[in-house]
Amino acid sequence: MATRSNARVMWRMLGLAKPLAGWMVLAVACGVAGFCCATGVPVLAAEAALSAVEAGSLPWTLGTTVAVLAVMAVARGVLHYVEQRCNHYIAFKLLAHVRDLVFGALRRLTPAKLAGSDSGALISTVTADVELLEVFYAHTISPICIAVLMTVVMGAFLGGIHPVLAAVALASYALVGIAVPVAVSRASGGEGRRSRDLAAWLSGFVLDGLRGLGEVLQYGAGASRLEELDRRSAELVASQRKLRARGAAGQATTTGAIMVLSCAQMLLAVWLAGAGLVTAEGAVLATVATFSSFGPFVALANLGSTLQGTLAAGNRVLDILDEEPLVAEVPDSEGRHPGFDGIAAEDVSFSYAGGSSADGVSASGEKILDHASVGVEPGQIVGIQGKSGSGKSTLCRLLMRFWDVDRGRVALSGTDVREVATSALRDAEAFVEQDTHLFHDSIRDNLLIARPDATGEELEVACRAASVHDFICSLPNGYDTMVGELGDTLSGGERQRLGLARAFLHDAPLLLLDEPTSNLDSLNEAQILKSLSDQRGHRAVVLISHRPSTMAIADKTYSMDQGRVS
């Protein structure tokens, strides 16, 4: 996690609000006008009371004064509503924009940078951390601007009575609106960030436990995991309690400071009136105005505690947005579009360079491929076999350009894949891994991910080729059947056949299949192998398998051992 100052985090988040600057100006204008009404009501009432005893200078009648007070009171409510409506419109628009940016960043980082990462922490960032930014966009930006402008307004009003009164008021505003929140923030230290990190860890721990609930129950590990969950939960509660305690102390300090400073202003006004430096009317109005003007600055004072968690969340979001992908996408305008005339790995060497493989296994820089060369011609079926860990799956991922090679090159139609537009590369290839991911959606929508504009007939043809159409039709809702989270209502073989159907529907000229029949019985295997054999001449197929029966349909077979190809 990068270390950024709070000011830097705020500046970066503020930059995202530029497209909504007009709404922000409206919110600030309504906020300033609303606080002017809030302060003006007691000031005008005091002036009316003074005029009633012939100590004021109000030129209006009592009826007019009451009408003006009523208008100002109603206006205060309306203006506050509009201000908050604008602030939350800005906040929710920006939260949607930030989510879009985060998902875009995750897509760029996948899979090389996210392999083996804590999915629970990512979920926490995408959901809870992004939601916490609402505090900044709805309750921080405009209150700061409103407080600054109200300082100018009140300084001008009190300065018109006496400069010393204005100076004391400005010092009071600075103490309440700046000194108190800064002190609370410093007292909190890194507790806000620690609290967010603990929450993210707990999210990952719970997600892990739910996914592995069967193993936890089978091996009686529930007590130890529950103990760890309780321990970390207690740490999170303690951290949040500290933040709330700091916030409560800040609020108490703010309230006490306002009372002391307002009384000091009152005593000063009395002294100035006694010395003949201001009129009695001026002393009363200055006192009333000061007592009623701290609203905008109380909002700032409260940020000292509430903003800690928000800035920590913002820092975690920026970590994702600023992360550089290991494999940079090639835009359509800059990349080449060579079509498909074969693909080849030419003298390729590769290691995960101390990171993690796509399976989340630390590679510690171990060379996975060592001067490996493989060629696939259009319409050809190529088999790759070898022991587990020999680099077969890694080779497929390099052909997909999920990672870039260390030496040599991967060439699509004679063009280095690093020069091919990413969209063109994805259109040319379809990859089915051993574990097919299915979304918590219908079978139809899971398949249409590969080609959203596919017709029902094309969908059926792909499913028949994957030997899964009859199974789908046997379900109560057919293609509209929900598959459950991660496809957990289906067997491994059913998920695998749906993955194959999705690849067939994509209709790419190159199919990369990693153990496509590992979860299938002999009957379904034979049907799928026949479908794959029928692809010969229509599209190229790369098969990774341990099964001799699968390799039997290959036109050419490579053997891999310790990263070398023979």
Predicted segments — roles?
Residues 14-19, 111-112, 128-137, 141, ...:
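An intracellular "coupling" helix at the cytosolic face of ABC transporter transmembrane type-1 domains
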Residues 24-79, 159-164, 277-280:
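Transmembrane helix-loop-helix hairpins at lipid-water interfaces of multipass membrane proteins
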Residues 2-4, 92, 100-124, 128-130, ...:
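Short intracellular "coupling" helices and adjacent cytoplasmic loop segments at the cytosolic face
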Residues 1-38, 58-65, 83, 87, ...:
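Membrane-integrated ABC transporters
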Residues 337-566:
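ABC-type nucleotide-binding domain
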Residues 51-61, 157-171, 246-315, 320-321:
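Helix-loop-helix
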Residues 85-104, 142-146, 169-214, 221-223, ...:
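Cytoplasmic coupling helices
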Residues 19, 23-36, 139-194, 267-278:
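Transmembrane helices of ABC transporter permease
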